[in-house]
Amino acid sequence: MMRSHYCGQLNESLDGQEVTLCGWVHRRRDHGGVIFLDIRDREGMAQVVFDPDRAETFAAADRVRSEYVVQITGKVRKRPEGAVNTNMASGAIEILGYQLNVLNEAETPPFPLNEYSDVGEETRLRYRFIDLRRPEMADKLRLRSRITSSIRRFLDENGFLDVETPILTRATPEGARDYLVPSRTHAGSFFALPQSPQLFKQLLMVAGFDRYYQIAKCFRDEDLRADRQPEFTQIDIETSFLDESEIMGLTESMIRKLFKEVLDLEFGEFPHMTFEEAMRRYGSDKPDLRNPLELVDVADQLKDVDFKVFAGPANDPKCRVTALRLPGGASMPRSKIDEYTKFVGIYGAKGLAYIKVNERAKGVEGLQSPIVKNIPEANLNNILDRVGAVDGDIVFFGADKFKVVSEALGALRIRLGHDFELLTCEWAPMWVVDFPMFEENEDGSFTALHHPFTAPKCTPEELEANPATALSRAYDMVLNGTELGGGSIRIHRKEMQQAVFRLLGIEAAEQEEKFGFLLDALKFGAPPHGGLAFGLDRLVMLMTGAQSIREVIAFPKTQSAACVMTQAPGLVDAKALRELHIRLREQTKVE
């Protein structure tokens, strides 16, 4: 072997021993005729000292530069008093180098590895192989590996089988656009890359495998955000003969064990909250419980006021009027209020009403707001009592369609929590349950809130009679306002699956064309089953404190779904297109 130890393995117990290291020159220093090289490998860093007494080795050390790949042999010794570096795991020792072999030279990197804060993300992605040398980046990928190992170990110990499902499959309606792959052997036909292994894992339950898992690559051709990539990794789990409480208990144990093993954090039992309560109190189906701010409905106090902005929504069952109190916010300048007004506009809000509570004892005179003149004093007091307002607070209001108010004030709640440093703890895991089966569109049609294979909490007849009020057997695990994973009990009876398809506007012929294999499987003794899928990239992002999932993926795509390093996607030659029976149309030039 070319090395005897990794740099990160060196410590005082090796004092006096000979070691051989392989790695990159992180930094070179020349102090008073002695050369110091900081050598870096994937496990850490070590300081190597070269004395001029060994002329040949000293000369070789004098020639090396940053990022040269080297092999060094030397003797471990304790550092002199006062020279210990507490920032390095091996900081109590150094190596007296007496043999140096340059394995490869290196040009000057496009950016220094220890000064990366001003380097643009595109440059970092173009030279990702350099960027990944930084200890901060290597640490994230190393932690990712520990996370997947812990999860695999837990699932293996609990009787789950790791089964691979196809990557080349057919398009199914799962909400986002599919990545399509043309078939050379079936002219005019296309495979689709899977958005999830959903149907295959259900078929594995029909086949009797009982407990399945897979760390699966999934693909979605959608607009990208900070927590989205066109290809992402999913921890996919499915079980038979367990109900939702048992599946939630099992996967909660897995996450608790993971955080204990990897971060040495003890989580208690995760609280449960219904979808309806989460939307009402937090304006989100993935609330961040670290934030103490809450939305409070006040429509009943504003139905009869002579102020249409409030009275209209207050009397409309499809709308809501909500208050959000910010403790100590009365000193907020108008410019900041305008900034927050612009912010909620992103979510469709037409404005942001507010009341500053300067001195409640003075009644209306102690309140500062353009809206107080339109609301009777008794109603104002009821509202302020309900939200718990005291002197020095500011209360914001939203009045509009339920979805607009929930999203706008829910987002404002999160923004205020961060801007005013209100978070009360570092971690807040929870479960959200009792989701609606469907979302009703403007035209009265329905869309599956999760996916079309989620089981409802009712019979097919009850579902078709009252689809708008039907609840599903779905559950989401949420951590710090981020959905870690979502799952449900699945439909295992053909009649129920057909009823759901009908409500989604998928008629019998289309059902047979797109889902005939699933409907067939449900006829042949499908067991009760359910599961859950975790987003691995998001989980690693939270556990490492990264700002984006691009920071925890070795070779991510940009926000335009491109790889600047390999220049993918790229053009292909005409011969390959002909073999695939594809002809490119000329793009119309816009003058």
Curated annotation (Swiss-Prot):
UniProt KW Ligase keyword: yes
Binding site for L-aspartate: E174, R220, H450, R490
A Gene Ontology BP annotation from the UniProt entry: aspartyl-tRNA aminoacylation
Alphabetical list of InterPro entries matching this protein: Aa-tRNA-synt_II (IPR004364), aa-tRNA-synth_II (IPR006195), aa-tRNA-synth_II/BPL/LPL (IPR045864), Asp-tRNA-ligase_1 (IPR004524), Asp-tRNA-ligase_1_N (IPR047089), Asp/Asn-tRNA-synth_IIb (IPR002312), AspRS_core (IPR047090), GAD-like_sf (IPR004115)
GO molecular function: aspartate-tRNA ligase activity; aspartate-tRNA(Asn) ligase activity; ATP binding; nucleic acid binding
UniProt EC number: 6.1.1.23
SUPFAM superfamilies named in the record: Class II aaRS and biotin synthetases (SSF55681), GAD domain-like (SSF55261), Nucleic acid-binding proteins (SSF50249)
Location (main, coarse): cytoplasm
Compartments in which it is found: Cytoplasm
Gene3D superfamilies xref list: Bira Bifunctional Protein, Domain 2, GAD-like domain, Nucleic acid-binding proteins
Stretches the record annotates as Aspartate: 198-201
Residues the record lists as binding ATP: R220, D221, E222, Q229, E483, G535, L536, D537, R538
GO CC terms in record: cytoplasm
Chain positions of site Important for tRNA non-discrimination: H31, G82
Keywords from the named record: Aminoacyl-tRNA synthetase, ATP-binding, Cytoplasm, Ligase, Nucleotide-binding, Protein biosynthesis
Catalytic activity entry: tRNA(Asx) + L-aspartate + ATP = L-aspartyl-tRNA(Asx) + AMP + diphosphate
NCBIfam families noted in UniProt: aspS_bact, PRK00476.1
Protein family: Belongs to the class-II aminoacyl-tRNA synthetase family. Type 1 subfamily.
Subunit comment: Homodimer.
Protein known as: Aspartate--tRNA(Asp/Asn) ligase
Protein species of origin: Pseudomonas entomophila (strain L48)
Lineage: Bacteria, Pseudomonadati, Pseudomonadota, Gammaproteobacteria, Pseudomonadales
